């Protein structure tokens, strides 16, 4: 039997980087600085690239990928090695899991009105099943804010004594060099004269508010970064013909840092978050103003 005590679900390394994946990466980097060799392993599907660690060993295991790997191969590894699991991305194996799980938020349970189309309802059903399973099976739950901790207790009856808060961080922004070339590529953006928002089509991100704000301030430039069909969504909302809105598409971390540093204000009109990393990152980058919604998670 292996001497490994904890085996981390490393399947997130194969996913596109977002707040949850960023949290997981930074958490493991911090763990690597304090754990003894052999105490923690990261288990990944085959062919997944990971950072280099000093004290944490990375193990490629199994034959599947994605959700199937999480549900079949990962718990098989835990059983074979007698290790506790550490799952950092809201999902655990439905069977065969013993250990610690990170729940970033319970948005699917708290705001079902955000998930009304067939795909959204299916996703909500899966995540709510996961929330219930984590509440029942995890030995401890980590979450990212006192607000999220209170929501887990409210909806799933998890006692506070079973939960710990490990906050999101901003320090990763210090390691990113700002990419000032974004301004040469978009000469409409003058430092200190534009509002900046990092958007997506998730309803909690409240993208329509940004467009309405742009419509109310026709003399101001609104720079919107983010992948997906943001322009198509603006057209669906009847807000596509706003000449002061500039869609930047997906931007690199370096470009985002430069845009945050030189904006007039960073906009984060969220309707629900477990933590909400972007305002903290914007503050770390020197954004002179940060405008957030008046919702409990932002207070």
Give, region by region, the residue ranges found by the protein language model:
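Carbohydrate transferase catalytic cores enriched for Leloir-type hexosyltransferases
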Residues: 1-299
């Amino acid at each position: 039997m292996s001497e490994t005590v904890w085996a981390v679900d490393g399947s997130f390394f194969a996913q596109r980087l977002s707040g949850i994946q960023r949290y997981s990466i930074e958490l493991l980097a911090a763990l690597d600085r304090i754990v003894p060799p052999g105490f923690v392993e990261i288990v990944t599907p085959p062919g997944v690239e990971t950072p280099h660690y000093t004290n944490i060993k990375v193990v490629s295991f199994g034959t599947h990928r994605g959700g199937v790997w999480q549900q079949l191969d990962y718990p098989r590894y835990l059983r074979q090695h007698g290790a506790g699991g550490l799952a950092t991305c809201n999902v655990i194996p439905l069977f065969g899991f013993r250990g610690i799980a990170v729940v970033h938020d319970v948005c699917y349970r708290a705001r079902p009105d955000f998930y009304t189309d067939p795909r959204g309802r299916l996703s909500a059903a899966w995540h709510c099943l996961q929330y219930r399973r984590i509440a029942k099976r995890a030995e401890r739950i980590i979450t990212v804010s006192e607000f999220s901790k209170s929501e887990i207790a409210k909806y799933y009856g998890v006692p506070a004594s079973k939960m710990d808060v490990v906050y999101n961080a901003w320090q990763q922004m210090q390691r990113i060099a700002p990419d000032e070339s974004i301004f040469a590529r978009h000469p409409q953006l003058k430092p200190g004269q534009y509002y900046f928002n990092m958007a997506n089509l998730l309803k909690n991100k409240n993208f329509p508010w940004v467009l309405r704000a742009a419509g109310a301030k026709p003399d101001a430039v609104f720079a919107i970064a983010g992948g997906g069909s943001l322009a198509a969504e603006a057209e669906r909302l009847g807000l596509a013909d706003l000449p002061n809105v500039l869609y930047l598409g997906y931007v690199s971390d370096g470009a985002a840092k430069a845009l945050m540093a030189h904006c007039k204000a960073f906009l984060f009109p969220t309707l629900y978050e477990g933590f909400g990393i972007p305002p903290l990152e914007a503050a770390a980058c020197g954004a002179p103003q940060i405008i957030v919604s008046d919702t409990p998670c932002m207070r």
